[in-house]
C-alpha cells in the first residue's frame, strides 16, 4: 500500500484472507485500501463489519477508535453528517484515543471551518504528544484530503474534498 499500487495490494490481501479466514488485520487492510482508493461506500461496509466483530473483543480494543474515525470520514464523504457524528458520540476529552479530537476536527473541516479544525488537532497534539500515537490519525486526514502531506503531492488531491483554502 505504501507504494500506492492499490490493485496489487488488494489482490494480495484478498489472497491472504483466503488463508486466514476472517482475520481482523487483513480485513482492516482491505477496508483501508478501499478508503485510500476513494471507494468510501465499500470501505464503510467493511469498516462497520469490523466494528461489529470487534465489539466486546479485547484483542481489538486499540483498533476500534481508528476504525470508527475512518467510518466517520466515509459518512462525511457520503454526505451523512449525522451518521458521522454518531461515531464520536460516546467519546469525550477523557478518551484513551485521539478520536474525540480528530473526529471533531473532521467535522469542522467538513463544515469549512479550517481554523476550528486546526484547534482540535492542536489539542490532540497537546493531549497525546507522541507522534507515533497520532501518526495513523494524521495520515488518515492526509489521505482524505483535509490536510496536506509533509511530502508534497498537493496537486493529487484535486478530486478530494476541500482542504480549507
Language model segments and positions:
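Register position in tetratricopeptide repeats
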Residues: 2, 19, 36-37, 77, ...
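Residue-level recognition of tetratricopeptide repeat
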Residues: 32, 73, 104-107
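Terminal, low-structured helical/coil segments at or just beyond the last alpha-helical repeat
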Residues: 114-165
Amino acid at each position: 500500500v505504501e507504494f500506492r499500487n492499490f490493485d496489487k495490494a488488494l489482490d494480495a490481501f484478498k489472497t491472504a484472507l483466503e488463508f486466514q479466514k476472517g482475520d481482523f488485520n487483513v480485513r482492516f487492510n482491505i477496508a483501508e485500501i478501499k478508503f485510500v482508493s476513494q471507494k468510501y461506500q465499500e470501505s464503510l461496509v467493511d469498516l462497520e463489519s469490523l466494528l461489529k466483530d470487534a465489539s466486546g473483543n479485547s484483542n481489538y480494543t486499540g483498533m476500534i477508535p481508528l476504525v470508527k474515525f475512518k467510518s466517520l470520514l466515509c459518512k462525511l464523504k457520503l454526505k451523512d453528517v449525522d451518521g458521522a457524528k454518531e461515531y464520536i458520540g460516546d467519546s469525550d476529552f477523557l478518551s484513551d484515543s485521539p478520536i474525540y479530537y480528530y473526529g471533531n476536527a473532521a467535522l469542522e473541516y467538513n463544515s469549512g471551518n479550517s481554523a476550528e479544525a486546526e484547534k482540535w488537532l492542536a489539542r490532540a497534539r497537546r493531549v497525546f504528544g507522541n507522534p507515533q500515537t497520532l501518526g495513523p490519525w494524521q495520515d488518515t486526514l492526509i489521505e482524505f484530503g483535509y490536510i496536506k502531506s509533509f511530502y508534497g503531492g498537493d496537486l493529487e488531491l484535486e478530486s478530494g474534498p476541500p482542504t480549507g483554502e
